Amino acid sequence: MDLSWIVGAIAMAVLIAWYVSYGAARLDRLHTRVEGALSVLDAQLVRRAEATLELANCGALDAASALMLAGAASDSLEAESADQSSREAIESDLTQALELALGEEALRRLRVDEALGAPLLQRVAAANQRVELARRFLNDAVTDVRRVRRKPGVRLLRLAGHADLPQTFEIDDELPMLVRGT
């Protein structure tokens, strides 16, 4: 055997090892990005629930709306350890409760109350906007992981190991009435 064949085989083995190592490290970084984005989303969901609970307890809303918001916000705060599909449903319920409670009349009353209502309304709007952004970042990270894990080399060499395939977080988080008027 010629020396050039041996050098070529070693170079090819090094190249393959580098490719596998690079792919595994990239996939690990993407999974870490998903975990970080999930933590950020969780924190933003808690902030939104806390802001909603403060709004419910401020006294500027009618009793039925305040009770509905307080119940939905409390459910959201208690759902931190729930599985993802349950958490998605609970967070969507909180958004729906906000939509129902914050009708035109309630929004007008809150915006007029500059001492308490308007700042709390702005806090809920800002918290909801941060939830929307955090959810987008998470879903983008999940999409990137799924794209890399679909590659034949990653599947063939099982570079993902035993890591679960991450799932997107799908909730109703749009509150157009807060975006327009706040």
Regions found by a protein language model. Name each.
Residues 2-182:
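A helix-centric hydrophobic-segment signal that preferentially recognizes long
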